[in-house]
Amino acid sequence: MANLKAIHEQAAHSGEGSRANIRSIWKEFSSVVKIGIVNSNLITTFTGLWLALYFMGEGFLENLHIVFFTLFGSALVIAGSCSINNFIDRDIDQFMERTKTRPTVTGTMEAKRVLWLGIIFITVGTLSLLMTTVTAAIVGLIGAITYIFLYTMWSKRNYTLNTVVGSISGAVPPVIGWTAVDPDFHVVPLVLFLIMFIWQTPHFLALAMKRCEEYRAAGIPMLPVVHGFAMTKRQIVVWVACLLPLPFYLFSLGVPFLTVATLLNVGWLALGLYGFKMKDDLKWAKWMFIYSLNYLTILFVAMVIATLW
């Protein structure tokens, strides 16, 4: 009986150890591929795809294969790009609080494996997008190349415009979604691209203000590091103001959507202007960052809901 009890206890401990090991592996994998970025970009990818189906008069259920290949391929291309970004930035990530525990910094994942993971993911993701349209695959590759070479390897460590350059790749996902259904030019994916492109600069500049000293320690020339908070706040307000006219190019989604989008834009702009009166710049930056996250989610969900009225 004693031996049997010991065996059961050993098995229980072994099971707990296995589960803990799986959780650890998943945590490391999620960190390397930046799972949060992947998930948020899939929201915009899906919205682009959904709107294309809506405007083209195509049924969702009849195109489930397109939905699958688009989301699967996009997820892999984005995850692969983020993996290579981690590989390249492993020397500076150690200086930042939010990145110093990444597996590429701690050494829990071999750098070469992370690089190959990224290459394989981008390759398989591109092949998946090819199952939809060639245009979608090309757009996905443009996003990956822009993120890896123009942003990570070139502008990030050299110019304060790195945020703007990085916004190009971040604006690509909804265009992938649209072109997977309709590869021809249309104003809607252009507007989606512009919304994402413009949104990212105030979003990441607010983050840069919050993490200013970390970026300074890492030697990354973010705008608040080089030109200070006052200049950064002015830039943020200008970029947010540029969002104001864009929803009106999506007037076919209806008045309720235009109302929601306009209120979101006006609210963000008002909060931005309030920053010139606030004395606590870091607190304001935190508010702006949180607002930007909610803004994007609400806006893109509202686009989908608008097609269901």
Curated annotation (Swiss-Prot):
InterPro entries the record matches: Protohaem_IX_farnesylTrfase (IPR006369), UbiA_prenyltransferase (IPR000537), UbiA_prenylTrfase_CS (IPR030470), UbiA_sf (IPR044878)
Coarse class of the protein's main subcellular location: membrane
Entry EC no(s): 2.5.1.141
Pathway assignment: Porphyrin-containing compound metabolism; heme O biosynthesis; heme O from protoheme: step 1/1
Disulfide bonds: none
Keywords: Cell membrane, Heme biosynthesis, Membrane, Transferase, Transmembrane, Transmembrane helix
Residue intervals passing through the bilayer: 35-55, 64-84, 114-134, 135-155, 161-181, 187-207, 236-256, 257-277, 289-309
PROSITE patterns (alphabetical): UBIA
Catalytic reaction(s) noted: heme b + (2E,6E)-farnesyl diphosphate + H2O = Fe(II)-heme o + diphosphate
Localisation per UniProt entry: Cell membrane
A UniProt-annotated Pfam family: UbiA
GO biological process, one term: heme O biosynthetic process
One term under GO cellular component: plasma membrane
Molecular function as annotated in GO: protoheme IX farnesyltransferase activity
Group of enzyme by EC: transferase
Membrane-topology descriptor: Multi-pass membrane protein
Additional free-text comment from the UniProt record: Carbon 2 of the heme B porphyrin ring is defined according to the Fischer nomenclature.
Family affiliation: Belongs to the UbiA prenyltransferase family. Protoheme IX farnesyltransferase subfamily.
Complex formation: Interacts with CtaA.
HAMAP family reported for this sequence: CyoE_CtaB
PANTHER family registered for this protein in UniProt: PROTOHEME IX FARNESYLTRANSFERASE, MITOCHONDRIAL
Function comment: Converts heme B (protoheme IX) to heme O by substitution of the vinyl group on carbon 2 of heme B porphyrin ring with a hydroxyethyl farnesyl side group.
Descriptive protein name: Protoheme IX farnesyltransferase
Species, as recorded: Geobacillus sp. (strain WCH70)
